[in-house]
Each structure stands twice: as structure tokens, then as C-alpha cells.
Design a protein with these regions (language model features):
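N-terminal/domain-start alpha-helical segments
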Residues: 1-125
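Residues within helix-turn-helix
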Residues: 108, 181, 197
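Short, flexible helix-to-coil linker/hinge segments that flank and couple to helix-turn-helix
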Residues: 118-132, 144-145
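Hydrophobic recognition helices of helix-based DNA-binding modules
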Residues: 118-121, 170, 210
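DNA-binding patch around the recognition helix
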Residues: 125, 132, 158, 201-235
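A structural micro-motif at secondary-structure boundaries
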Residues: 135-164, 192, 223, 229-235
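Short amphipathic alpha-helical recognition elements used for nucleic-acid or partner binding
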Residues: 154-190, 206
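Short, positively charged loop/turn segments that connect secondary-structure elements
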Residues: 190-197
Length: 235
């Protein structure tokens, strides 16, 4: 497998240098920059598989950058934040980040998260090559290889990697109640923590994109005290 290329976007020089050295030592091809403008230049020229993106950059906001990236790319994104509250984390997931870490972080934990996402990137690419399934539900058509949904009005609804993976879990377990721990493990390969809202945020994102009325969902139902139920699949 070719060396995977990680882009570090961190304005703090010491942290940037440490991350650069650490991931190079783990065998990755690494580019490190300190601004959003530099990040955009690298992305235009290089084949990047994953971005470690600091939320607070001098020339832009990491959350806005994540939203922009997700508009045209399925690249892996891990947000790095210095805040301990959940707001940035939740918003980051809502706009399309794959994961997040809070400073100060353990480099080995960050490495594990990077490996996890890169393995998912590779798995998704392989799945796109081999998966031929199309799923239909409630007037929608989910094209798994293309990782997109044909809307009721004929428009194309694009899915982020995390949304795609969660939807694949749901269509593979139609009419089955899945608890958050099981969903978390299948989508992120981490155990669910009661304070972690990753799955709830992803389900809400799918509801907003796919339900007729996301406030009264019929496809992705909450089973109180247990988890979520996906129903309505016709193929």
C-alpha cells in the first residue's frame, strides 16, 4: 500500500513540530502548515488522505473549513480543539468531521484515531469498487457505491463518510433495534461513552437529509432506553 499522506493544520509551532515528527516516525508521509490558506494550497497539489485540523486558526475557523471540505471531498478530518465543552465537538460532527480530539491529547490516542479513520477510508474505497447494491426507502434511492442518495425530487443528496457508514449499518440491520454502543463500534470502532453524542449527532444529520420531516422521523426512530431503529426499506 502506498504511504498515506497526512496534512497537519496547526498554528502553534511547537505542537505542529511535535505532530510532524511523531507521525513521520510512525511511517506516514506528513505535511504540516499553520494557516488555512496554506492548507488549501497543499490540498490543491497533493493527494491527502487525512487532515488534522485545528479549530482556531489565525485566518479562518476550522468548523467553517470542515463544512467547505465536506462540500466536495470525502477526505478524513479530525478536528483538534482546546476547549473542553461539547459545543465545538457537536458542531464539528454536524458539519462533517470524522472525529475530534481535545488538547492536551495523548499522541498514542491520536495515532489510534488516525489509523482508525485511514482504515475506514481504505475500506470505503474498496467497498465502492465492489458494492453494487442500491437500496430504496420512502421515495429515496441509496446508491451505496456512489455514497449518495437520490432525493424524492430527483436531487442528489451527498453523504459524508460517517453518514454513509452509519446508513450502511442501518440498511444491513433493517427493522432491528441497535444500541448506541453497537453503532459506535461499527462506525468509529470505539466503545460508546454516555457523554459522547457522536451517534446522536450522526442520526440527526441523516434525519435532516433523508426524512420528510426530521422533527417527526419515520425512517430513523428513537427507541427510548435502547437505541435506534431503521425501517421502511423496500430493497
Amino acid at each position: 500500500m502506498p504511504t498515506q499522506h497526512i496534512l497537519i493544520v496547526e498554528d502553534e509551532p511547537v505542537t505542529r513540530t511535535k505532530l510532524l515528527g511523531y507521525f513521520k516516525g510512525e511511517g506516514y508521509l506528513v505535511t504540516a502548515v499553520g494557516t488555512a490558506a496554506e492548507m488549501e494550497q497543499v490540498l490543491e497539489k497533493e493527494d491527502i488522505q487525512l487532515v488534522l485540523l485545528d479549530i482556531n486558526l489565525p485566518d479562518n475557523n476550522g468548523l467553517l473549513l470542515t463544512r467547505e471540505l465536506r462540500g466536495h471531498s470525502s477526505i478524513g478530518i479530525i478536528l483538534v480543539t482546546g476547549k473542553t465543552d461539547d459545543i465545538d465537538k457537536i458542531v464539528g460532527l454536524e458539519v462533517g468531521a470524522d472525529d475530534y480530539v481535545t488538547k492536551p491529547f495523548n499522541p498514542r490516542e491520536l495515532l489510534a484515531r488516525v489509523r482508525n479513520i485511514l482504515s475506514r477510508v481504505n475500506a470505503a474505497s474498496s467497498a465502492e469498487d465492489s458494492t453494487k447494491a442500491t437500496y430504496r426507502f420512502d421515495g429515496l434511492e441509496f446508491d451505496a457505491p456512489k455514497r449518495q442518495v437520490l432525493g424524492r425530487d430527483g436531487s442528489i443528496i451527498k453523504l459524508t463518510r460517517a453518514e454513509y457508514e452509519l446508513l450502511m449499518v442501518f440498511v444491513g440491520h433493517h427493522n432491528q433495534v441497535l444500541n448506541r454502543d453497537r453503532l459506535m463500534n461499527k462506525v468509529t470502532h470505539r466503545s460508546w461513552d454516555p457523554s459522547d453524542r457522536t451517534i446522536d449527532v450522526l442520526v440527526m444529520r441523516l434525519r435532516k437529509k433523508l426524512e420528510r420531516d426530521y422533527k417527526s422521523p419515520i425512517l430513523f426512530s428513537t427507541v427510548h432506553g435502547e437505541g435506534y431503529l431503521f425501517s421502511g426499506l423496500t430493497k
